[in-house]
């Protein structure tokens, strides 16, 4: 229930109006990777959310981010492509990519742009402001992402909630499914007490890349750390690519299971959409 309330509060801040004029110095394209196969929710990108396919709702939110010059769906499935072509550009990709970054890179080779933002295809309520700040960071950084404070003790030890620690310059030191850092002097305390003692950060699954950085990154094989944690961003850190972490006050509302559809539809109804 607590997560639901936070999600509703966050969703009330999502902007549905027209975007402001862009002021960035690099041309940035948004790419949404979409796969049909899913163990928990096959065909998820085409699931209807209040009458619209999930992938369409993600595209519409991306288009409200003024920093994006274009929004593209990248898929290896003709069923997704057929639907997505009704409302945006589609690029077909190989089905054999080991990560979303590799899929995005295939599309990047065909694009005339300076930067790319990889937006998760299962977040129909993603705040355009989050996309905006990740894209803007590419004016000065080779790679960027976003993080928010962990407030829910249920997320503290959850391996599906990826944690990140950053240095004084706001760049990632490490990402992990384990709780990091380890609070040695508070190890015996409860999760609530540890959250009060240190500003733990939760990684949000959105990535910005300079095009050249992305194309260089995917030349490297899957790294040992990436393979161990199953976190693709660790390949970048392994090879010395700095990742700027933009801190935002945002709680994502994703669609992971079929039952999440009703939750998102309730939030849309609450917002009058």
Where do the model's predicted regions map?
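Acidic, Ala/Val/Gly-enriched low-complexity intrinsically disordered segments
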Residues: 9, 14, 20-21
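N-terminal glycine-rich phosphate-binding loop and ensuing alpha1 helix
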Residues: 26-74
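A residue-level structural signature of the nucleotidyltransferase/glycosyltransferase Rossmann-like core
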Residues: 72, 123, 163, 206, ...
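Short phosphate-binding loop-to-helix
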Residues: 72, 78-133
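A conserved hydrophobic position in a structured secondary element of the catalytic/binding core
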Residues: 75-76, 126, 209, 256
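Conserved core of the sugar-phosphate nucleotidyltransferase
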Residues: 126-223
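Conserved alpha/beta core of the MobA/IspD/sugar-nucleotide pyrophosphorylase nucleotidyltransferase superfamily
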Residues: 189-273
